[in-house]
Amino acid sequence: MSDSEDSDFSDNQSERSSEAEEVEENEEEEEQGSVAGSDKAEEEGEDLEDEEEYDEEEEEDDDRPRKKARHGGFILDEADVDDEYEDEDPWEDGAEDILEKEEAEVSNLDHVVLDEDHSGSRRLQNLWRDSREEALGEYYMRKYAKSSGGEHFYGGSEDLSDDITQQQLLPGVKDPNLWTVKCKIGEERATAISLMRKFVAYQCTDTPLQIKSVVAPEHVKGYIYVEAYKQTHVKAAIEGVGNLRMGFWNQQMVPIKEMTDVLKVVKEVTNLKPKSWVRLKRGLYKDDIAQVDYVEPSQNTISLKMIPRIDLDRIKARMSMKDWFAKRKKFKRPPQRLFDAEKIRSLGGEVSHDGDFMIFEANRYSRKGFLFKSFAMSAVITEGVKPTLSELEKFEDQPEGIDLEVVTETTGKEREHNLQAGDNVEVCEGELINLQGKILSVDGNKITIMPKHEDLKDPLEFPAHELRKYFRMGDHVKVIAGRYEGDTGLIVRVEENFVILFSDLTMHELKVLPRDLQLCSETASGVDAGGQHEWGELVQLDPQTVGVIVRLERETFQVLNMHGKVLTVRHQAVNRRKDNRFAVALDSEQNNIHVKDIVKVIDGPHSGREGEIRHIFRGFAFLHCKKLVENGGMFVCKARHLVLAGGSKPRDVTNFTVGGFAPMSPRISSPMHPGGGGQPQRGGGGGGGGGMGRGRGRRDNDLIGQTVRISQGPYKGYIGVVKDATESTARVELHSTCQTISVDRQRLTTVGGKERQGRSSTHLRTPMYGSQTPIYGTGSRTPMYGSQTPLHDGSRTPHYGSQTPLHDGSRTPGQSGAWDPNNPNTPSRPDDEYEFAYDDEPSPSPQGYGGTPNPQTPGYPEVPSPQVNPQYNPQTPGTPAMYNTDQYSPYAAPSPQGSYQPSPSPQSYHQVAPSPVGYQNTHSPASYHPTPSPMAYQASPSPSPVGYSPMTPGAPSPGGYNPHTPGSNIDQASNDWVTTDIMVRVKDTFLDGGVINQTGIIRSVTGGMCSVFLQDTEKVVSISSEHLEPVTPTKNNKVKVILGEDREATGVLLSIDGEDGIVRMELDEQLKILNLRFLGKLEV
């Protein structure tokens, strides 16, 4: 201090001492004379006596705390969260001693304060009188800055701060350190107990453990803390403990500043919001569900909305709660029921009103009967509360703000937020509501965002419930939860609580909550969650119906069926359809159409549209059009309503139709009759009929670059350019699909040039109606007789009956197979020229390529050689089985000439299996058998030793070839008409006479067997389709098309005109004229 300050301080001290002495003298002299002085002394004396009495009570009850007694008026009992146990306040432990020291000096302290007040007021008056501003400011600085409030009130505040500091000493460098030791997860507590037992066991030995403590916090998994001075002490303690084997070689010391955090217990304050759910811990409403109405954080209370439990028996007895419980020995909790004011009044209870609430026994009830009551925060369970669906139904139909989808989840976890770094969010609660920003990091429920505001440049931290996702129009997002989970799309509209997005896959508008969206750049894969199905996949709905998946949802599919209707089905209700990439159909111009072809719709509801074929099923095609919004651009139409882009009408196929029915399969025409009946030339074609024409592999430059049309096979009707060609095959680049394929040259026709002709046409004058096979395209469904066209002349009778042997053994091979080495043809040709040897395997074709059947020379000697063919029993002419392969068997009734057993000779027909036609039926669809001339075939072999003998004019055909009479019921030999749900009649040919002529309904078809429900006997029997015939429908009957291109379609028969009927189809409501034989009557 300076000299002036020292002098001022000494003057002040002298003034204070003199003033104190004067005050004491005045009090002693004027103790009875001054009323004011006596009153003041009495008040001071009473204060001192009260404090002394209070201290005496404290000394008597030192063994129990007096915290609540002293501070009961300032602390709320309800706000004490940890009411299960009470701790002494550390401040009180240190402060009681200090207060005891100060109580003896209270009187002196009061005198000092009075002296200071008197001296200060006197000096203040002098300063005001002299008007010295500097001195006045210095006075106030000294008065209010010289001591703190605590020092002025308690005095000796230095001792108090020292004692408090002693209670909060932090660990230093001289204290033991904490070491983290890796432990087996889940065994932390048990490991700490085992170390404690080990410490006790070694305590009285020569080598006690040097560790001080072991800590296993609940929130730390996989580690424990060991307190010791050195790391070697820790290793010695954990040696031999199995759970600590993994941490024996590596222990890490905890920094000194972080040691206190290991034992710090921070009680998480539950942030309850209105409309959230809690359960009661105890009391009458224990475990009852309740909804938060409002929260009072200052009073630590919470108001709940719940279903009351009112004991009506007690109200009826007019007893108080205390008397009622005293009377009833066993407590019985009343059931939950909503408050009914009328019922309470009827039992004698008093109900009053307070605004919108009803008051009964000091409790508030709403108009709907719910109880609103306040509870302490410690009386409720706030974590993991999930109301069940039954509780929600009792509580309310759908409480406000509750997401039933979330509530019904079986998991006990709280619904976690789905916020991620990079999401755009906005604040929905608190002071910064509507503030937008971008998430920088996510740490549990703490979200750090960078606000998008010009005045806010620093990151801000928010709890997750105060944020919600924010999207702008044009954002590309992905649905991460809810009904449309996994779908992606573009946001087209943003509402207050939901977002409208346009799906990338299905092109539908989806309405989704913002919390279920996430910004993304990729597009949905279109595969369901299980990976079993994908968008646009062909699935089987039932045995007769297929469809295409047009929308994938979490639990269901939306399927566009073949009839154009969209159905919603569950995942388990559909089966994946076998891949039909190679399916073929015919368009309106008889062009072949395949999957991935570009076609145009010329008829039906989608007329004028263009699209790409995705699937073909029977006569239906599923197409995809990028310009169509509905169903993701998928639509279905009939194949005959399409026209192939770039295609042209192929050769006429009218001679293959019956009654206007065009075969849907492209394999109905014979592959060996290009251009209408000519035989193919020698080369690679022929399907291996005679084993000839393998080709040398030389390039044919003349054909390269020419535009050709494919005339046969699965690509029939396609036009393309030849890129490469050899003697047998050509590589053709198709115009429509831009793909290059290999095609047999025999199946190509140059556009603009003449079609290839055979050697000679052997077609008859008129197409034989009776000999057309297969009937109604049955051949195209089984490969055995698929490509047979009129094999031989069946309309002539008698069948070569009057001919006699025209040629002897010396004839030239003009009418026989010229390249057959087994025939004694003269002159003979060398084998190497035609690559045909005697040791070749016999071909299934009965003759050489392009030749006619070659009879044996009558004079040819019999040579004992193994017979190639098995015994062949030709069909009796009266046998009804002609073309139906299911009915063929070696017939028991031989022809009048007897069974055909040719003499052993090297000549053979090379038939592997007998043909039901009886004459050289080949299995190869490419082989060609022209109609034989009358002189080339000896039709009536007999057991004569000289080979063949002429047939008598009246003898039947040995091959059993019995052509149908034109106009006969041609569909009776086929079972293609069989389908489900139609009414049939059992024919007389069935063995069981009890069901003959009964009518029934076909329930299912398996192969050639039908399960028929007989209406008369009400039983189900299995009958072969050959013993059934369809019931002819009558007017106004509901019918089903059983034959033709509209097969399986249904409709109503409006009228009958002769053998035709007018039908209104159900699918497109069109009127069609169909033959009655093409219709089956549906079940009534």
Swiss-Prot record:
Q: How is it modified after translation?
A: Phosphorylated. Phosphorylation by P-TEFb (CDK9) at Thr residues of the C-terminal repeats alleviates transcriptional pausing and promotes transcription elongation.
Which stretches does UniProt call biased (Acidic residues)? 20-32, 41-62, 77-91, 832-842
Location of the region described as Interaction with RNA polymerase II in the Swiss-Prot/TrEMBL record? 312-419
Map out region (8 X 7 AA approximate tandem repeats of G-S-[QR]-T-P-X-[YQ], motif CTR1) in residue numbers.
Answer: 758-815
Please list the residue ranges that the record marks as compositionally biased, kind Low complexity.
894-909
Primary residence: nucleus
**GO cellular component annotations, sorted alphabetically?**
DSIF complex; nucleus
Chain positions with Phosphothreonine modification: T773, T782
Chain positions covered by the region annotation Interaction with SUPT4H1: 175-269
Q: Name one Pfam family in it.
A: KOW5_SPT5
Listed Pro residues bias regions: 855-864
Q: Region Disordered: what ranges?
A: 1-91, 667-700, 748-973
Note the segments forming the CTR repeats: 758-763, 764-769, 770-776, 779-785, 786-792, 794-800, 801-807, 809-815, 842-849, 852-860, 861-867, 879-883, 894-900, 902-909, 914-919, 922-928, 930-937, 941-948
List compositional bias (Gly residues) regions by residue number.
674-694
Residue ranges annotated for the KOW domain, each copy included: 272-305, 419-450, 471-502, 593-626, 702-735
| Region entry 10 X 8 AA approximate tandem repeats of P-[TS]-P-S-P-[QA]-[SG]-Y, motif CTR2, spans | 842-948
- Which positions bear Phosphoserine? S665
One GO BP annotation of this record: transcription elongation by RNA polymerase II
Keywords annotated in UniProt:
Activator, Nucleus, Phosphoprotein, Repeat, Repressor, Transcription, Transcription regulation
The record's SMART domains line, in alphabetical order, gives: CTD, KOW, NGN
- One MF term from GO for this chain? DNA binding
> InterPro entries per the record?
KOW, KOW_Spt5_1, KOW_Spt5_2, KOW_Spt5_3, KOW_Spt5_4, KOW_Spt5_5, KOW_Spt5_6, NGN-domain
The annotated subunit structure for this chain is: Interacts with SUPT4H1 to form the DSIF complex. DSIF interacts with RNA polymerase II and with the positive transcription elongation factor b complex (P-TEFb complex), which is composed of CDK9 and cyclin-T.
Q: What does this protein do?
A: Component of the DRB sensitivity-inducing factor complex (DSIF complex), which regulates mRNA processing and transcription elongation by RNA polymerase II. DSIF positively regulates mRNA capping by stimulating the mRNA guanylyltransferase activity of RNGTT/CAP1A. DSIF also acts cooperatively with the negative elongation factor complex (NELF complex) to enhance transcriptional pausing at sites proximal to the promoter. Transcriptional pausing may facilitate the assembly of an elongation competent RNA polymerase II complex.
Q: Which family does it belong to?
A: Belongs to the SPT5 family.
Q: What is this protein called?
A: Transcription elongation factor SPT5
**Organism per entry:** Danio rerio
